[in-house]
Amino acid sequence: MDDNTKKELQSAAFDRLLNHLRKRKDVQNIDLMNLAGFCRNCLSKWYREEANKRNIEISDPDAREHIYGMPYSEWKEKYRK
């Protein structure tokens, strides 16, 4: 498999993970952290760090909005238990 195809597949799998987490609002970050060792906030941090490595400025709130699919404050208000 060539590198471009591999990156396309990885990107598609990541998009599916994000969509899955956006649908599963019942799954709390603390549960993800306890079971898997990462949560939505970790994903947003990793996303921002990878952007910064490429000299792309993304704020923490913007990175979180990308991962959560809405502003983090809105998600917390609606779904955090």
Which residues are covered by each model-predicted region?
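Domain-level signature for proteins that mediate thiol-based redox and metal-cofactor handling
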Residues: M1-K81
